[in-house]
Amino acid sequence: MSRFTGSTWKVSRRLGYSISETGKELKKRPYAPGQHGQRRSKLSNYGIQLQEKQKVRFVYGVSEKQFKKTFLESAKMQGKQGENFLKLLESRLDNVVYRLGFTKTRAQARQLVNHGHILVDGKKVDIPSYRLAPGQTVQLKEKSKNLTIVKEALEAQFAHVDYVALDANGVGTFSRLPERNEFLFDINEQLIVEFYNR
């Protein structure tokens, strides 16, 4: 399955969850799009599990193939698989670029990485799924700081999560892996584990 490129607002309304993590999509119309959007049918257990999986997949903007591959990697780690799975997604380069406030959305962050605007430990990395290890640095190329999407994001001064840091020179650090209570608060990752293990 290819990466989704349609309206994220419609997806958020269909899932009943803000995939932009701002809540804006659901303020005006907190129901599914379409003629019968306000009539939400009762979901089966499978439907509930699928919906939870889709919420997370769309939040991070990854294809089904990448999503499942990451899930299988998390099975090889010690600890709770669902929690490890989310931590692997959270340590993706495109996500950390977004968390550092270099862009307003993960889609923009993915674009920056793809186009070679991002340096990791001083070297260009253009793979959005590149997984950062704690202590690695992330920064924009000097000329990339003048991009409109970057300027607008930096001016907005989004609050950073505690597991990334940005210094006065614009160099970000992926300080540590996040604790589970620091991100995606409303997601039940166990439902995703059950979906793939059914």
Curated annotation (Swiss-Prot):
Residues 91-154 form the S4 RNA-binding domain. GO terms for biological process: ribosomal small subunit biogenesis; translation. Disulfide bonds: none annotated. Residues 26-45 are annotated as: Disordered. The keyword Ribonucleoprotein applies. GO terms for cellular component: small ribosomal subunit. It holds the Pfam family Ribosomal_S4. GO terms for molecular function: rRNA binding; structural constituent of ribosome. Keywords: Ribonucleoprotein, Ribosomal protein, RNA-binding, rRNA-binding. Part of the 30S ribosomal subunit. Contacts protein S5. The interaction surface between S4 and S5 is involved in control of translational fidelity. Belongs to the universal ribosomal protein uS4 family. One of the primary rRNA binding proteins, it binds directly to 16S rRNA where it nucleates assembly of the body of the 30S subunit. With S5 and S12 plays an important role in translational accuracy. This is Small ribosomal subunit protein uS4. It comes from Acholeplasma laidlawii (strain PG-8A). The lineage of its organism: Bacteria, Bacillati, Mycoplasmatota, Mollicutes, Acholeplasmatales.
